[in-house]
Amino acid sequence: MSNLKWFWLFLKTRSNWIFWIVFLHLILLGMAYIDYDISIESIGFIVTLNLGLTAMFLIFTFLKEVKLYQHLYNNKEIEEIKHKDLAEDPFQKEVVNYLYRKLTSQKERVVEQQLHIQSTEQSLTEFVHDIKTPVTAMKLLIDQEEEGKRKKSLLYEWARINELLDKQLYLTRLESKNRDMYFEETSLKRLVIDEVQLTRHISQAKGIGYDLDLETNLDVYTDVKWCRMMIRQILSNSLKYSQGQDIIIRSYTNDGHVTLEIKDFGRGISHKDLPRIFERGFTSTVNRNETTSSGIGLYLVNSVKDQLGINVRVESTVGQGTTFVLTFPKQNELMARMTQVTTM
């Protein structure tokens, strides 16, 4: 904001006093005009002198008081304003002291809440880690069961529990994901096969197979743990809304970028739901009675894709299925993006 605009605002706030001073001087001029014993020239000189001194006083006052408002306008910290003692009159000082006390109290509350949230997240993370130990032991016990329908059912339920625990674990790690990432060159085929193996019990229970067309020599520069999480959530989403039809997974290069395509033939996503599928907690506006979906999986995908530099594109037709296309960045592009994030 320019100084002229600041001065105009200053004059508007003092308009009552200015009008009052002008009014008093007009009365003096009127009295001099009516009373012949009073010299109009003398009164005119006095009025001119008073108005000139008043203008100088207003300019001087403006230069002193405007510093406080300019600091507030520029979003300066209240501590800086208080330290520089920019408040000139008692009213301004009371306002600054009030804001200082209020903001200090709010900051203390925010710190307390952040510590509470961190403590809760830490407790939840420890709980998930602790509960995964008996879940792993449960898997060993299930593996000792004889082959049959009972074992398949147990493996299916175990896989669902393990998936939910992993989802919750990654959800609690979102805030610290930047510190938790380690980028390295790895085989995309290996990442996909590992996740297919992890979800095989659910796919077998639903009669769904995997049609894999993965090029052997395609490597990506990424964080293995978080990238696997993205693939897992997309596979989980495809398995959840498919029944009895294979999921096609293929990899290829497109314009120098490694691309992973996951296509299912499930119920698909409606056109009006497509822009919202990455929102936390969003499930569907069509199938409102759906209780198996939490709306967390694709939210996790959306939360880490930018840090990994992966572009995610979704195509879907109701009744025909959904295709997720993951385009990986080149290593130099990812490094440049990470540098930009670091310098921001």
UniProtKB/Swiss-Prot annotation:
- Entries under PROSITE patterns matching the protein: HIS_KIN
What EC number(s) does its UniProt record assign?
A: 2.7.13.3
The top EC class is transferase
Q: Which Pfam families match?
A: HATPase_c
Q: How does it sit in the membrane?
A: Multi-pass membrane protein
What cellular component GO annotations does this protein have? plasma membrane
Task: State the Gene3D superfamilies in the record.
Answer: Histidine kinase-like ATPase, C-terminal domain
List the catalysed reactions: ATP + protein L-histidine = ADP + protein N-phospho-L-histidine
Know the name of this protein?
Sensor histidine kinase GraS
**Source species of the chain:** Staphylococcus haemolyticus (strain JCSC1435)
